[in-house]
């Protein structure tokens, strides 16, 4: 069994989603949001994110962490803040010796919905379906669960399927 933590980083709200994978089947463990205080400086917000991720790592002991890659914002200041939040989340996971993988928004949508330009509500719907949830989680938590699901799909990708079948190489006849 593998426990995967998906992280949707943000300087105000960082979503997290935990799933377990066993025999190529996934199941929901937990999800939620780490909300930072509005009235503190960026450095203290980053510490809150770090502490929140460390708490999740200590409590659930995931061995693999998946996080969304940065995409270019129209506002460079927002992109920098997102980069900081992403960085401290990665450091928190790395300090617990977890394997960390990064995925683009397009890869996540393609893996979960089957369409790389899917809308957020389509992703949320598929998260509910794939994890057999009674209702949709909070927006940032649903995104984090989608990231974890994407990682599960990618780690069990085509190359592993081909390798597990024990296919033999055949010599091509001319």
UniProtKB/Swiss-Prot annotation:
Name of the protein described by the UniProt record: Crossover junction endodeoxyribonuclease RuvC
Cellular component, GO annotation: cytoplasm; Holliday junction resolvase complex
Binding site for Mg(2+) 1: 8, 140
Segments crossing the lipid bilayer: none
Keywords carried by this UniProt record: Cytoplasm, DNA damage, DNA recombination, DNA repair, DNA-binding, Endonuclease, Hydrolase, Magnesium, Metal-binding, Nuclease
Native species: Legionella pneumophila (strain Paris)
HAMAP family with a match to the protein in the record: RuvC
InterPro entries: RNaseH-like_sf, RNaseH_sf, X-over_junc_endoDNase_Mg_BS, X-over_junc_endoDNase_RuvC
UniProt remark on cofactor binding: Binds 2 Mg(2+) ion per subunit.
Family according to the record: Belongs to the RuvC family.
GO molecular function, one term: magnesium ion binding
Record's function text: The RuvA-RuvB-RuvC complex processes Holliday junction (HJ) DNA during genetic recombination and DNA repair. Endonuclease that resolves HJ intermediates. Cleaves cruciform DNA by making single-stranded nicks across the HJ at symmetrical positions within the homologous arms, yielding a 5'-phosphate and a 3'-hydroxyl group; requires a central core of homology in the junction. The consensus cleavage sequence is 5'-(A/T)TT(C/G)-3'. Cleavage occurs on the 3'-side of the TT dinucleotide at the point of strand exchange.
PROSITE patterns linked to this entry: RUVC (PS01321)
SUPFAM superfamilies in the record: Ribonuclease H-like
Subunit record text: Homodimer which binds Holliday junction (HJ) DNA. The HJ becomes 2-fold symmetrical on binding to RuvC with unstacked arms; it has a different conformation from HJ DNA in complex with RuvA. In the full resolvosome a probable DNA-RuvA(4)-RuvB(12)-RuvC(2) complex forms which resolves the HJ.
Gene behind the chain: ruvC
Active site: 8, 68, 140
CDD domains in the cross-refs: RuvC
Cofactor: Mg(2+)
GO biological process: DNA recombination; DNA repair
Pfam families, per database record: RuvC
EC class name: hydrolase
Record EC number: 3.1.21.10
Annotated residues for binding of Mg(2+) 2: 68
Keyword Membrane: no
Location in or out of the cell: Cytoplasm
């Amino acid at each position: 069994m593998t426990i995967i933590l998906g992280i949707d980083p943000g300087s105000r709200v960082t979503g997290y989603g935990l799933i377990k994978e066993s025999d190529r089947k996934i199941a929901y463990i937990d999800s939620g949001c780490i909300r930072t205080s509005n009235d503190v400086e960026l450095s203290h917000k980053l510490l809150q994110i770090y502490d929140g991720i460390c708490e999740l790592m200590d409590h659930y002991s995931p061995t693999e962490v998946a996080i969304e890659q940065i995409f270019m914002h129209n506002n460079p200041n927002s992109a920098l803040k997102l980069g900081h939040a992403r960085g401290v989340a990665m450091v928190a996971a790395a300090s617990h010796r977890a394997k960390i993988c990064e995925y683009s928004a397009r890869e996540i949508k393609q893996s979960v919905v089957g369409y790389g330009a899917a809308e957020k509500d389509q992703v949320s719907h598929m998260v509910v379906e794939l994890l057999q949830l009674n209702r949709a989680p909070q927006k940032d938590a649903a995104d984090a669960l989608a990231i974890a699901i994407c990682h599960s799909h990618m780690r069990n990708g085509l190359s592993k399927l081909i390798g597990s079948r024990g296919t033999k190489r055949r010599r091509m006849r001319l």
